[in-house]
């Protein structure tokens, strides 16, 4: 405000007109699971496979390293990782486990990786070997190496090992779901609520590989997706048949697919990937690969693109064969899509492709928001505008404020139309929806509407066999 009296010159800075809207991040995966090492019940930002290394190697039973490998097969991506395995709690003990050092390599392997508190004795138990003097140990992978200058005899020497090891079978659905502990700290998936204050964004794609097949976990993932404006990717259990997957959409089903939420994407079946540790194929949840693909499509094409009909990376096959023909409504993949289940299309020359555009809202909800890309585009628009509008909160309600808001929002819409994210957009101030009583209470309402381009899910050619072009025939000279 200007001074009452000034013998001189002053400048008063004013802010008027529209302001740009910052788009929120969409390609962020929230991963809840188990790792052999790494922070416990803490949301950790992972931006690459280098960051992923802090959660250890891919070991049987641990879900986080496998899921991170699936995501980073698509390149870089942002993953918020919550490891719920606490080695001080989720542990078992191996007592006097027989181990034998290989005569050629001088190495012995424990039956369980992610070990701790190792005590190694000779076969009779009379001599305790010293780490660093007699042997070196890789506790993560469970490999003991004989030191040549130590007291462990060379050759195929037998020994006995007693140790604790991180046991993922001790992790329960309650651990994955999480809670607020006595110290007021969130654990499990509930810690996803803390990420905005930590990193400035929320996860928009939620996965809990292996654990999401439990109905108790899947319903909590759905609830978290609603709170965060995200989509939860949920798998059917390993071994689920096609008939069981379809039946699971109803109340008589025996699996976790009975939902009509537009915050859930149902994934079936599991996929096969190559396991370097065993030199063989193993099954992996489709949700991990689908989440990595979704993030990649967001970055390469845009969040308004469907991730369906895109190549799955790192996948060698599917758990069970599914018939897939582009023109057969009775094919297995089409029947799954018809019931709102995302699957894998594998036909001659097609490769392995993610197949399915719709969330679990289909077929109950016929509004176009049952398309995942439509739902997610709406989420990005709505959240971006909410965060952008903070700068206007508590400003005086006047015509300048209303004009700035409407023009800013319309400018955002024009940008999205130019990007190809929208077909149309309009924001406006409606005096009839803003009575003086509401304005007097400090409440202002701005309307906006938009249209997201739906994916081309069904293409129909209408053809006619006609004789009319016979008239183009001409006689010779």
From Swiss-Prot:
Pfam families this protein is in? Phage_sheath_1, Phage_sheath_1C
Query: Could you tell me which InterPro entries the record lists for this protein?
Result: Phage_sheath_subtilisin, Phage_Tail_Sheath_Structural, Tail_sheath_C
A GO cellular component annotated for this chain's UniProt record is: virus tail, sheath
What keywords tag this UniProt record?
A: Host cytoplasm, Viral contractile tail ejection system, Viral genome ejection through host cell envelope, Viral penetration into host cytoplasm, Viral tail protein, Viral tail sheath protein, Virion, Virus entry into host cell
Where in the cell does this protein reside? Answer: Virion; Host cytoplasm
Q: Which GO terms describe its biological process?
A: symbiont genome ejection through host cell envelope, contractile tail mechanism
Q: Does the keyword Cell membrane apply?
A: no
Q: What does this protein do?
A: Polymerizes as an extended structure around the baseplate-tail tube complex. During ejection, the sheath shifts to a contracted form, thereby making the inner tail tube protrude through the host cell envelope.
Q: Which family does it belong to?
A: Belongs to the myoviridae tail sheath protein family.
Assembly and partners are described as:
Homomultimer.
Name of protein: Tail sheath protein
Please name the source species: Burkholderia phage BcepMu (isolate -/United States/Summer/2002)
């Amino acid at each position: 405000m200007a001074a009452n009296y000034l013998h001189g010159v002053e400048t008063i800075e004013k802010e008027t007109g529209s302001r740009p809207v910052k788009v929120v991040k969409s390609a962020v995966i929230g991963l809840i699971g188990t790792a052999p090492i790494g922070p416990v019940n803490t949301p950790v930002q992972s931006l690459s496979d280098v960051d992923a290394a802090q959660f250890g190697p891919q070991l049987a039973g641990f879900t986080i390293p496998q899921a991170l490998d699936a995501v980073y097969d698509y390149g870089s991506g942002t993953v918020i990782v919550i490891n719920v395995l606490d080695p001080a709690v989720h542990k078992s003990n191996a007592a006097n486990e027989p181990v034998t050092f290989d005569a050629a390599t001088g190495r012995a392997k424990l039956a369980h990786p992610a070990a701790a508190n190792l005590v190694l004795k000779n076969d009779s138990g009379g001599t305790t070997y010293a780490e660093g003097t007699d042997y070196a140990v890789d506790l993560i992978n469970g490999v003991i190496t004989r030191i040549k200058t130590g007291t462990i005899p060379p050759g195929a020497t037998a020994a006995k090992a007693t140790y604790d090891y991180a046991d993922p079978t001790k992790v329960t659905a309650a651990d994955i779901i999480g809670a607020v502990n006595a110290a007021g700290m969130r654990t499990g998936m509930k810690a996803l609520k803390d990420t905005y204050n930590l990193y400035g964004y929320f996860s928009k794609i939620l996965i809990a590989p292996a654990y999401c097949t439990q109905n108790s976990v899947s319903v909590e993932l759905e609830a978290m997706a609603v709170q965060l404006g995200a989509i939860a990717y949920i798998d059917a259990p390993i071994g689920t048949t096609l008939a069981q997957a379809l039946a699971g959409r109803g109340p008589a089903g025996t699996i976790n697919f009975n939902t009509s939420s537009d915050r859930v994407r149902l994934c079936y079946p599991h996929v096969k990937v190559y396991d370097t540790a065993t030199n063989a194929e193993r099954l992996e949840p489709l949700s991990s690969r689908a989440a990595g693909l979704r993030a990649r499509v967001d970055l390469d094409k845009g969040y308004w693109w469907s991730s369906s009909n895109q190549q799955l990376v790192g996948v060698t096959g599917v758990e069970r064969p599914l018939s897939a023909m582009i023109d057969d409504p009775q094919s297995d993949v089409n029947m799954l899509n018809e019931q709102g289940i995302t699957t894998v299309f594998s036909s001659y020359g097609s490769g392995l492709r993610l197949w399915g555009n719709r969330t679990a809202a289909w077929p109950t909800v016929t509004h176009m928001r049952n398309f995942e890309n439509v739902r997610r585009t709406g989420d990005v628009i709505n959240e971006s505008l909410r965060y952008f509008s903070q700068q206007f909160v508590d400003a005086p309600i006047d015509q300048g404020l209303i004009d700035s808001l409407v023009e800013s929002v319309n400018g955002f819409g024009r940008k999205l139309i130019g990007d190809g994210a929208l077909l149309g957009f309009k924001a406006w101030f409606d005096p009839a929806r803003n009575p003086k009583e509401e304005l007097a209470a400090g409440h202002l309402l701005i309307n906006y509407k938009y249209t997201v381009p739906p994916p081309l899910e069904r293409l129909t050619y209408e053809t006619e066999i006609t004789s009319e072009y016979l008239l183009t025939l001409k006689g010779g000279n």
